[in-house]
Regions:
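Canonical Rossmann dinucleotide-binding motif of NAD(H)/NADP(H)-dependent dehydrogenases/reductases
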Residues: 3-35
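A glycine-rich helix->loop->beta "capping" turn
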Residues: 6, 63-66, 79, 86-99, ...
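Active-site-adjacent segment of SDR/Rossmann-fold oxidoreductases
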Residues: 23, 29-30, 138-141, 169-172, ...
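The beta1-alpha1 cofactor-binding region of Rossmann-like NAD(H)/NADP(H)-dependent oxidoreductases
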Residues: 54, 71-85, 114
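Substrate-binding pocket helix/loop in short-chain dehydrogenase/reductase
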Residues: 60, 108-109, 116-118
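A short, exposed helix-loop element centered on a Lys and neighboring polar residues
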Residues: 132-133, 176
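Catalytic loop of short-chain dehydrogenase/reductase
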Residues: 146-170, 175-176, 180-184, 193-213
Length: 214
């Protein structure tokens, strides 16, 4: 275990699998105490299970790190507040927030339902706000904090992903504004634009296309 983040507390949303899991494990490896948030749903957001978050917490503890699971949805203000509250109640502070939770409801725009649009916007764009707002209350008081948001190259436009692209590009504007709002309080806010093969992005259709391309 490293010690670069010793004494720091981090929240990672959508940390049960994929990029979020890797982020949570790395933070713990560097000495941070981690709140592992994951609703445990399918890639489209349906269903829920505690096992993904629990498994990551176990991995961290098996490596002699400290972590706690949280199963709230980022799509509601109450869920976001409770995720941040979990860090305070368990570890007494918050230093790092990584907004990573996401779902997909891919469909060509002419076939996309309002419900499919709303579901993706709620988890990605609202989810970033719902966790960032209560975190910033704490960060402003302590005059320090780090926020890392998760955008995507799909924000520049991707076939069949009008909802996802809109949310991910919205996160870029949100990030820039939060950085300006919070910079005077010693808080940074940045976004990453990953291109990654994860459970969320490697759909059966994409997997079939990759196989055909071999």
């Amino acid at each position: 275990m490293g010690d670069r983040l010793k004494g720091k507390v981090a929240v990672v949303t959508g940390a049960g699998r994929g990029i979020g899991r890797a982020e949570a494990l790395l933070l713990a490896e560097e000495g941070a105490k981690v709140v592992v948030n994951d609703l445990g749903g399918a890639p489209d957001g349906s269903g829920e299970a505690t096992s993904p978050a629990d498994e990551v917490v176990k991995e961290i503890k098996d490596r002699r790190g400290e972590a706690v699971a949280n199963y709230d949805s980022v799509a509601t203000p109450e869920g976001g507040e409770n995720i941040i509250k979990t860090a305070i109640d368990t570890f007494g502070r918050l230093d790092i927030l990584i907004n990573n939770a996401g779902i997909l409801r891919d469909r060509m725009v002419f076939n996309m339902s309002p419900e499919e649009w709303d579901a993706v916007i709620k988890v990605h764009l609202y989810g970033h706000f719902n966790c960032t707002r209560p975190a910033c209350v704490i960060f402003r008081q302590q005059r320090s904090g780090r926020i890392i948001n998760t955008s995507s190259e799909a924000g520049l436009g991707n076939m069949g992903q009008a909802n996802y692209s809109a949310a991910k590009e919205g996160i870029v504007g949100f990030t820039r504004t939060v950085a300006r709002d919070m910079g005077r309080y010693g808080v940074t806010c940045n976004a990453i634009r990953p291109i990654a093969a994860t459970r969320l992005t490697v759909t059966p259709e994409l997997q079939a296309a990759l196989e055909r391309a071999k």
